[in-house]
Amino acid sequence: MIKIPLNTLSAKSAAALDQELMSSGAFSIDQLMELAGLSVSQAVFKLQPLNKGKRILVACGPGNNGGDGLVAARHLFHYGYQPTIYYPKQSKNELYQRLRKQLEDLKVPFTEDFPGALKQTDHVVDAIFGFSFSGEVREPFPKVIEALESTSIPVLAVDAPSSWSIEDGPPESGPGKGFMPPALISLTAPKPLVKHFKGRHFLGGRFLSPEMAEQYNLDIPKYEGLDQVVEVPVESGKL
């Protein structure tokens, strides 16, 4: 685990960075989602080696966070895991349709029964809401987040534990008030919520140019070997 402090990236700055990556950075949304999902899959591999259980339940929301989950599930399948997808509010966007088709071609199952699937898994990926989340948790996700909050199954949250405010952390009431998953992977850079997080913290962002990192005052940690993720201490987030 690295010990250097890392700066955090607000929701507004994260959105601006994404737009810049897709303009002056010349990345496509497909590339960014592929890199994010690959990072998520590697974090799962570090947290849940195959000999600890192969069944992975990936809970996907309707936006980019859910897309990251779909990509991660595809990589996990090729690593030898047995992913199951919970994707109740599917986007009609062509990118997400292709990501679903790729999983269907691999015979990866989709389920509408989250409580049932949760009883038959070894690990959960929370890819429901990401850095753009705000407001109330809408159906069908309140009960899903409550189930994640109470389960003893290990959970990896993608960019943010679902229902959390990117700036302020867990909500004061309602679904997710007590949601503290064992692990979190921050994508590109940690968000301010990390100051409230108490579990293991990974960073996936091994694609930023030094110039863009400097522009957004971000630190690029040292990644080992072929790794797309690095574990960082949660107390490293600076505001």
Swiss-Prot record:
Q: Which residues form the YjeF N-terminal domain?
A: 14-220
Q: What is its main location?
A: cytoplasm
Quote the cofactor binding remark. Answer: Binds 1 potassium ion per subunit.
Q: Which Pfam families match?
A: YjeF_N
Q: Where can this protein be found?
A: Cytoplasm; Mitochondrion
Q: What is its EC number?
A: 5.1.99.6
Q: Which GO terms describe its cellular component?
A: mitochondrion
Q: What protein am I looking at?
A: NAD(P)H-hydrate epimerase
Q: Kindly report, in one word, the top-level EC class recorded for this enzyme.
A: isomerase
The keyword NADP belongs to this UniProt entry's keyword annotation: yes
Residues that coordinate or bind (6S)-NADPHX: 64-68, 130-136, 159
